[in-house]
């Protein structure tokens, strides 16, 4: 069945003429972090792909609109970020359908072509449902574990140690709904934000281009 293969990197022969790395951001939009991420991407004139949680898109539609208007990809990361392996088929289908609707409601002009399972945990039900909606399932090939707040240098070093042409880099702009201490939300992703410029500059110094997913 179409789109049942999970994408963890982009075939360099099928991609752009120049070697590319693909930055992706999960769990947003986040009113404290997403605007600053977008500012940094704009400063460097690069595009990325944002895997947004539908519940967050409902609360922050303006950020979804900004993501799209500034030329980035917006993608499905389910409605409430559950572990799909613990969900029934109807629950899986509802999570994916409702997230798509929330994104389109927030930004009617959005083109949703990709989906990423929360925690990277795919199920047959999720893959079949994604295929029925024409969504390509995306994993990642580079994970600096920025969600664990290991330090800016660690995030940068882990990306640079693993990145190569076609790599899909996993970063985060928020966390699962309700998972973080509310008092820490304003600074939750400060390390990720601080790392982005260094990552972009270093990848470019290697002759790599940063783009949103094709």
UniProtKB/Swiss-Prot annotation:
Residues that bind a divalent metal cation: 77, 81
Record: active site: 26, 172
Site for Raises pKa of active site His, residues: 146
Subcellular location(s) of the protein: Cytoplasm
Domain annotation NodB homology: ranges: 19-211
Signal peptide feature range: none
Classification lineage: Bacteria, Pseudomonadati, Pseudomonadota, Alphaproteobacteria, Hyphomicrobiales
Gene3D superfamilies: Glycoside hydrolase/deacetylase (3.20.20.370)
Full protein name: Chitooligosaccharide deacetylase
EC code: 3.5.1.-
Example GO biological process: carbohydrate metabolic process
Function: Is involved in generating a small heat-stable compound (Nod), an acylated oligomer of N-acetylglucosamine, that stimulates mitosis in various plant protoplasts.
Broad class of the protein's primary localization: cytoplasm
GO molecular function ontology, one term from the record: hydrolase activity, acting on carbon-nitrogen (but not peptide) bonds
Keyword Transport: no
NCBIfam families: nodulat_NodB
Similarity comment: Belongs to the polysaccharide deacetylase family.
Keyword annotations: Cytoplasm, Hydrolase, Metal-binding, Nodulation
Gene Ontology CC, one term: cytoplasm
Superkingdom, taxonomy of origin: Bacteria
């Amino acid at each position: 069945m179409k789109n049942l293969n999970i994408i963890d990197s982009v075939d360099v022969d099928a991609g752009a003429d120049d070697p590319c790395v693909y930055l992706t951001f999960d769990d947003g939009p986040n009113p404290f972090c997403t605007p600053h991420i977008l500012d940094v991407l704009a400063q460097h004139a690069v595009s990325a792909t944002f895997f947004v949680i539908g519940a967050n898109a409902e609360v922050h539609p303006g950020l979804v609109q900004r993501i799209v208007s500034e030329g980035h990809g917006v993608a499905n990361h389910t409605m409430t970020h559950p572990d799909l392996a613990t969900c029934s088929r109807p629950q899986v289908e509802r999570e994916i359908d409702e997230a798509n609707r929330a994104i389109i409601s927030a930004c009617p002009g959005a083109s949703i072509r990709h989906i990423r399972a929360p925690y990277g945990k795919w199920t047959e039900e999720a893959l079949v449902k994604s295929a029925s909606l024409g969504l390509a399932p995306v994993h990642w090939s580079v994970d600096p574990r920025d969600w664990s707040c290991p330090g800016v240098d660690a995030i940068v070093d882990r990306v640079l140690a693993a990145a190569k042409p076609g790599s899909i880099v996993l970063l985060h702009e928020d966390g699962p709904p309700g998972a973080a201490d509310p008092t820490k939300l304003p600074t939750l992703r400060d390390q990720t934000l601080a790392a982005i410029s260094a990552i972009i500059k270093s990848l470019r110094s290697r002759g790599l281009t940063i783009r949103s997913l094709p």
